[in-house]
Amino acid sequence: MNSTTTKNVCGDKWYLNLDRPEEALKILVFIAIFVVRTLLHYLMKPLGQPYLTTDFAIGLILGNIPRFRGAFSGPYSITLNNIIEFGMICHMFVMGLEMNPSVLLRPPTKDAFIAYTSMITTFVLAFVTTPFLHYTKTSPYIFSLALSLMASSTGSPILTRVIANLKIRKSDLGKLASAAGVHTDMISTLLYCFGFIFFPTEKPLARPLHRFFRALLMFCLFLAQVTFTSIVSPIFLNWVNNENPEGKPLKGSHLVMSLAFVVLICSFPTWPPESMYNPILSAFTAGLFLPNKGRMSKWIINKINYLLSTVFYPIFFFWVGFIIHMRNFDITDKMAWVRFFSLLGTVIAGKVTGTVLCGLLLGYHVPETASLGLLLTTKGHFHVYLAALAIRTNRVKSTTGALIIFIIVFTVVYSPFVVMDIIKRARKRVPVHIMALQWLDPTTELRILIGLHGPHNIGSTLNVMEICHGGREPGSIFYATDMVELTDEIAATLKKGGGAGQSNDSVTVTDRSVTEMRESITAAVNGYGELRNGQGVTVRRMLALSTFVTMAHDVCGLADELMVSIIILPFHKRLNPDGTLDAGHAGFRHVNRKILKNAPCSVGILVDRSFGQTEEAWRPGASMGIAIIFIGGRDDREALAFAAQVARHPAVKLKVIRFLEDKSSQNAQKRSSILNRASVVDQEEEMKLDDECFAEFYERYIAGGGRVSYMEKHLTNSSETFTALKSLDGEYGLVIVGRGGGRASSGLTTGLNDWQQCPELGPIGDVLSGSDFSHNTSMLIIQQQRTRGQLEGLHDDFTIL
């Protein structure tokens, strides 16, 4: 029995019969495209190249293989052209839907200024040069207008993808490039829409009056589409979104109505046969003025983008390769190469000149604005389509059109390298120092910023200073920082003219309650500084006077400026007379959380139950029992580094308690699937770092009869971890733990955070600070410096402009 699939698409001439080799070859072409595409993109991923580059390379090769070209000749080429046109309609619709036309009605922002300036300089330069190079013999000035507009535009989807892939979209330059690219793309495509109305690509009508009425008809249809879409679509889509809330399946009838509505607004300007309005540009206009917020719009964007990226774009570039036909490429055509280098130079020079001039007015660095200009030269699929269409309609020679497409693709090829150069320069200009105890150079002084909410923190602050110093060489600097909320009453008492001991020397605080509080704290910490004078201890006073909204930012800025290794903050809850903790201060809790998230160094939160009331560690004969719990992970390693500072003090009796997971237990075996889901390489690297760090500590402070004692506990699950923590109840005055609560793969803490009251303390710290734990044991929860972002040596939101 013959397996024959018959589909009549073009009269009686196209029948897809898989029994015939030339028919099966069509299927083989598409399979080859998708397979080779995946492999080639994987190989080019280290270069940061987007799919457009690999798709073009594959399409150019496969589209020029004679057997493949023969399989798609004749009526099949018509079908392929129809597929490409439909795909471009979808591409332009979703591109418009992702844009926001309301920015055109607002005062121009920096990105708009850069977009306008770079567009104008490139357009003027291109329009001055292109008419003399004779790209086409039909309507040369109209073609020069279109080519100049293409040269001045930007392919925002490709540019945004390159910026996101190389992880600079949160930086100031990344944000500016993305916004300016979208603005440029939107303006240039709208100008294409207007240009098509007055200069249609179809054969012009003989009489000027007829041409005028056709242009008037298309303009009226354009205005009707914009008006109808802007007014009706928000009402309709808001109703659909309200009827289909998040979390519930989309109703089929509403989905069908929404798609029908989209098809209606995209197509109705093309209904009158006299209009000849371009359906691709009509789809862009419809998408542009549709609301892009809401569930239905997001659903449409996601689905269409998925189909475009996985199915359409590979076929599109096969069509482009088919159109180019390298056999017709005349490499000896000198004039074509003059056009090539002239247009490439015009695109680069125009964009770079415009952005540099605008950047100078805005106060940006020239190298960065030049890089921004190079990024804005990036073109996209729409520009490739226009160039290929010019070849197909014989408006340009095949060689000239192919070289224009090569220029478009070349602007995409070098964009990732421009971004890499930006990152390289940012690393030099914006170095990020690793400020953590674990990597502290032993030959440098220890710098610690200690926050105080009031006089009740004096005792714990002095004890922290003492145990951290421990006779350390070359010494320690402690920045005792008062964290004071800036209320309206306090703001009314501020006077210009700095006061001594304040971090902000532009004002003096005259509020009586604040000055009395600061005087009592200053007397205590200065007294300790005088006591340790000559022993390498330096105490300095700081003030963070801010609202709770900005206090975390000020403290982090102070820590960065002072280059401290760790910030130690008081817990937001205070000790009651009965030994319990009160409900806490919501403002200081907010500050602690923000500092944990944004601090440039390590952070410790001190839960003071009795630490500030115990015998001062510097008194003769004083003794203080301190324990550190080590499970594993970066925070536990930082806690161990803090314990190493504490271990030097003669009055401290330090005990290291290491919780080890029993690998032979059934629980550990069940968790192997979790390890498989997580990055096994990362987990093994973490375990290696833990073992190396602990071995170094053990050899230095525990082995050979050191003063630090050691205990291991082999546990199987979080329940046994909780029991082990309860067994420490009341034995130590201070317990040091890492906020992370061990490695992500550790089963010893899994489940402990299900009922967390204070997530900022981590699973172990939250248990130890609970109301059912000892009222005599204080906790210090430590978090190692978080290097935000995925760029090595840089934060995601680095600033370089």
From Swiss-Prot:
Gene Ontology terms for molecular function: antiporter activity
GO annotation terms (biological process): potassium ion transport; proton transmembrane transport
Pfam families listed in its UniProt record: CHX17_2nd, CHX17_C, Na_H_Exchanger
UniProt KW keywords: Antiport, Ion transport, Membrane, Potassium, Potassium transport, Transmembrane, Transmembrane helix, Transport
Primary residence: membrane
Entry similarity comment: Belongs to the monovalent cation:proton antiporter 2 (CPA2) transporter (TC 2.A.37) family. CHX (TC 2.A.37.4) subfamily.
Function description: May operate as a cation/H(+) antiporter.
Gene3D superfamilies the record matches: 1.20.1530.20
UniProt-listed InterPro entries: Cation/H_exchanger_TM, CPA2_transporter, Na+/solute_symporter_sf
PANTHER family referenced in this protein's UniProt entry, alphabetically: CATION/H + ANTIPORTER, CATION_H(+) ANTIPORTER 28
Chain's gene name: CHX28
Organism for this UniProt entry: Arabidopsis thaliana
Tissue-by-tissue expression: Specifically expressed in pollen.
Record carries keyword Repressor: no
Membrane-topology descriptor: Multi-pass membrane protein
Subcellular location: Membrane
UniProt name for this protein: Cation/H(+) antiporter 28
Superkingdom, taxonomy of origin: Eukaryota
Positions of transmembrane segments: 24-44, 77-97, 113-133, 140-160, 179-199, 216-236, 252-272, 275-292, 304-324, 343-363, 371-391, 403-423
Gene Ontology CC terms: membrane
